[in-house]
Design a protein with these regions (language model features):
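Conserved ABC ATPase signature
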Residues: 139-143, 147-149
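The feature captures the beta-strand-to-loop junction immediately N-terminal to the Walker
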Residues: 38-40
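Helix-to-loop junction immediately C-terminal to a conserved catalytic motif
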Residues: 53
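Conserved ABC transporter NBD signature motif
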Residues: 61-69
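Catalytic Walker B motif of ABC-type/P-loop ATPase nucleotide-binding domains
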Residues: 164-167
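Conserved signature/switch motifs of ABC ATPase nucleotide-binding domains
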Residues: 83, 138-141, 159, 192
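Short coil-to-helix segment of the ABC ATPase nucleotide-binding domain corresponding to the Q-loop/switch region
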Residues: 99-107
Length: 242
């Protein structure tokens, strides 16, 4: 594993019955970079994310995080790894509706045995930079779609993970809000020196990333390509009311 690599999949294969989802995929994620995994539905892109993130085990192949092999770990250790070294942003946020925003963000810390008061203090520090000031006590149902995704971004980053995984993070948002959400996701992740892996079918989303990898029928079709990004704004919290 390269000294500049944070996460590496080697020869990853995964099948579901007769359906081959991954057919021997190699992918390296470097420190601090954003990588888009693109492909149509059923191409294997989400399966690749799940194998890299330790959500599922590949049938064969290896996954290494910071030089350590993780695909052979038991579920308990992989669960702890997902909670501490990885962050996740999903299409619909997956926030707990009964908890205020600040406790949704604090939850990964509390699951890692940080006291509730300390976890909430750490969680609150994310709200201003992400344009969520004053929304700490709101429940998910009181937030717009874009605001809820910003809360999910804060939750993904609160443990200072090595890698953030985002699966169709703008799929439920309108174009303008999705653009703003991707800008914040990329900028906040890079600011915290984490790598970002984004699964998407949308070239506009992929355009925010440093590299694009295309997956089809379980194979990577081409080598990683540089993304074409335009119009990136600076400052996480611009247009924060969406």
């Amino acid at each position: 594993m390269s000294s500049h690599s944070v996460l590496e999949g080697r020869g990853l294969k995964k099948s579901f019955g007769p359906t081959v989802a991954l057919a021997g995929v190699d992918l390296t994620i470097h420190r601090g970079e954003a990588v888009a995994i693109m492909g149509p539905s059923g191409s294997g892109k989400s399966t690749l994310l799940h194998c890299l993130a330790g959500i599922m085990r590949p049938d064969s192949g290896e996954v290494h995080l910071l030089g350590d092999r993780i695909d052979t770990l038991g579920e308990r250790r992989r669960s702890a790894l997902r909670r501490t070294r990885f962050g996740f942003v999903f299409q619909f946020g997956q926030l707990l509706p009964e908890l205020p925003a600040e406790e949704n963000v604090a939850l990964p810390l509390m699951l890692g045995d940080v006291s509730r008061p300390q976890a909430v203090r750490q969680a609150r520090s994310w709200f201003g930079p992400l344009g969520l000031g004053g929304m700490e006590g709101r429940r998910p149902g009181e937030l717009s779609g874009g605001q809820a995704q910003r809360v999910a971004i804060a939750r993904a980053l609160v443990t200072r993970p090595a890698v953030v995984f985002a699966d169709e993070p703008t799929g439920a948002l309108d174009q303008a809000t999705g653009h703003d959400t991707m800008r914040i996701l990329v900028e906040a992740t890079k600011h915290n020196e984490a790598s970002l892996v984004v699964v998407t079918h949308d070239p506009h989303v992929a355009g925010w990333c440093d590299r694009v990898v295309e997956v089809r029928d379980g194979f990577i079709l081409t080598g990683p390509l540089p993304a074409q990004t335009s119009g990136q704004a600076s400052g996480w919290a611009q247009e924060g009311s969406r």
